[in-house]
Amino acid sequence: MNRKAVVLGGTGLIGGELIKLLVKNNSYSEIRILGRRNVDIASSKIRFYKVDMENLQQHESLFEVDVVFCCLGTTIKTAGTKEGFRKVDYEMVMNAAKNAEKYVKKFILISSLGANANASNFYLKTKGEVEKMVLETKIESISILRPSILYGNRVEKRSGEKVGIAFMKFATPILQGSLKKYRGIEARTVAEAMVIYDLEEKKGKFIYESLEIENLVKNN
């Protein structure tokens, strides 16, 4: 294969792992990284485009690729306000999906366990709303991944998340049955699943929960 991909959120935890995998995978010939800063990964496959992420609609020609991997995401604490958070997790994703709708057949989005447009929690409500918006586009194949708390070496330190990870690792053995879906998951595992979903010859719109993601990678 000779696939071209756009990666959004490449400097994040999952995005960074994803780019490493794409660089090594012979199915991909070009990786377009759109953002404010480049990644610290050297490869002849990588094309970095410094773009205004708040005005992605001005860069729609960059979306003339086979697949868009959207790993955009922040926290309310990092963004400073709910409005700032929504600008990244909803508006930027919306603009990316609208650009992708014109060109690509596959769009793969990182969401969150518990995403629900009707949730009372602002974070989960926003994630649910962006899922709904993406699913309503005319993109032929959409995969939405809902990972639980992520394990990995994050450049951006999130103190609250650090506590959550420590607790999750302690609690993992007792999370059985229907509670298994709450177990933490390695960022690399999520990235591996994104590549698998892209290379599958499957059309349609799908949502994958954290445990499904884990099992997919284990069985491949």
Kindly give the residue locations of the regions a language model identified.
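Oxidoreductase cofactor-interface core, primarily capturing Rossmann-like NAD(P)-dependent enzymes
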Residues: 29, 117-217
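SDR active-site strand-loop-helix element
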Residues: 8, 34, 71-72, 107-113, ...
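NAD(P)H-binding glycine-rich loop region in Rossmannoid oxidoreductase-like domains
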Residues: 5, 46-95, 99-102, 116, ...
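Short, polar loop motifs at secondary-structure junctions
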Residues: 33-40
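Short, conserved active-site loop motifs that form the nucleotide-linked donor/cofactor pocket
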Residues: 45-46, 142
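N-terminal Rossmann NAD(P)H-binding glycine-rich loop of SDR-like oxidoreductase domains
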Residues: 3-25
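Conserved Rossmann-fold NAD(P)-dependent oxidoreductase catalytic core, especially the SDR/UDP-sugar
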Residues: 25, 82, 87-131, 136, ...
